[in-house]
């Protein structure tokens, strides 16, 4: 009798657990939670966490609550693949990540093999979506678009000037630098210096000496905020006054913290600041109430979760392939970063880059400000 009761209780607990699991849908967030890009990892993690909290409060997705597993890829491709395999083993269906293009690409292959849909809020290398994969999307733009904006700006405002181009040898950094050079070439310009550095280095004195010798009037940087900040600081230390210009990889307040006062005047390409959009007002207030400023990729990560929810509800399914089909269909999604729709590759259909300049704010802090009409020459 006791054995029968024990078996009955065990069966009851198993059914309860199964019922709980069936009432949930598992997401993963993969990004650099630690390492040199940890500030961006925090943006992504907070963006996903807040979106999940808000969606769950409103009833979840198709009546199921979202659970999230967080994976730290440390901006390393091998670790990204390890995280992807762990997510697959744990039954994750949807992933928001990764940050670095060079991590996203091998990770997305693991996700495809395991039927998992991935949306990156930050990986901008064109090849992320040029591999004819059903499962990879992004909420950001592409480097060929970003490079076109940067190169066109250089041709218009630095015609006849000397341009040095420096990159960090990564898929993202070198790719962005090369796309910018292509756009410059269309305007009859080419760099006087083209150099690659190693991520993680601290001493860029040799590089700065080359920049100084080149007589560069502008230094274009293809890379992230840590190395970019160090390069600017060391340029100023050696008396190089040429402004820096970079891409969305420097959109973090950490750039100014690392680079110091010398980052003022830095030019940058990035999407229109989503914090200023009416659609984001309530969510931005939620973040600020928690003492977290939703800069850079925070809202792009939040938007990724919103897209999955809306596509799943339109598809009336939580099967990743059916959700992907709905996303590829041209459906419009209402998100905190504005309306989005996707092409067959998984790219957003809007051109998403404008010009910014880093300048001192009334509170004394140096941060990035969108230039009216993308003309930073009019900014005082």
Q: How should each PLM-predicted stretch be described?
A:
Residues 2-13, 22-380:
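Extracytosolic ligand-binding ectodomains
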Residues 18:
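Phosphodiester-processing cores and adjacent nucleic acid-binding clamps
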């Amino acid at each position: 009798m006791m054995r029968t009761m024990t078996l009955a209780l065990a069966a009851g607990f198993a059914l309860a657990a199964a019922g709980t699991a069936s009432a949930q849908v598992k997401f993963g967030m993969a990004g650099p939670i630690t390492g040199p890009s940890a500030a961006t990892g925090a943006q992504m993690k907070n963006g996903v966490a807040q979106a999940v909290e808000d969606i769950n409060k409103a009833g979840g997705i198709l009546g199921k609550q979202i659970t999230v597993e967080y994976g730290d890829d440390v901006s390393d491709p091998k670790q990204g693949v390890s995280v992807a395999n762990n997510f697959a083993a744990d039954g994750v269906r949807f992933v928001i990540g990764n940050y670095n293009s060079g991590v996203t690409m091998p990770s997305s292959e693991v996700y495809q093999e395991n039927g998992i849909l991935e949306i990156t809020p930050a990986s901008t290398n064109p090849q992320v979506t040029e591999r004819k994969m059903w499962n990879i999307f992004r909420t950001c733009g592409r480097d060929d678009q970003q490079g076109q904006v940067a190169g066109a700006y250089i041709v218009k405002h630095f015609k006849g000037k000397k341009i040095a181009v420096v990159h960090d040898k990564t898929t993202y950094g070198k790719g962005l630098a090369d796309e910018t050079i292509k756009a410059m070439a269309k305007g009859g310009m080419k760099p006087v210096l083209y150099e690659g550095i190693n991520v993680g280095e601290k001493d860029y004195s040799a590089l700065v000496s080359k920049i100084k010798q080149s007589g560069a009037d502008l230094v274009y940087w293809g890379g992230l905020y840590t190395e970019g900040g160090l390069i600017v600081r060391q340029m100023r230390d050696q008396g190089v006054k040429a402004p820096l210009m970079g891409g969305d990889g420097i959109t973090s307040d950490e750039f100014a913290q690392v680079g110091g006062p010398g980052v003022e005047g830095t030019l940058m390409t990035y999407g229109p600041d989503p914090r200023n959009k009416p659609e984001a007002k309530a969510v931005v207030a939620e973040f600020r109430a928690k003492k977290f400023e939703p800069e850079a990729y925070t809202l792009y990560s939040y938007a990724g979760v919103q897209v999955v929810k809306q596509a799943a509800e339109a598809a009336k399914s939580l099967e990743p392939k059916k959700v992907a089909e709905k996303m590829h269909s041209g459906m419009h999604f209402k998100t905190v970063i504005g309306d989005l729709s996707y092409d067959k590759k998984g790219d957003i259909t809007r051109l998403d880059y404008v010009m910014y300049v880093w300048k001192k704010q009334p509170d004394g802090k140096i941060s990035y400000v969108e230039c009216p009409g993308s003309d930073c020459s009019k900014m005082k």
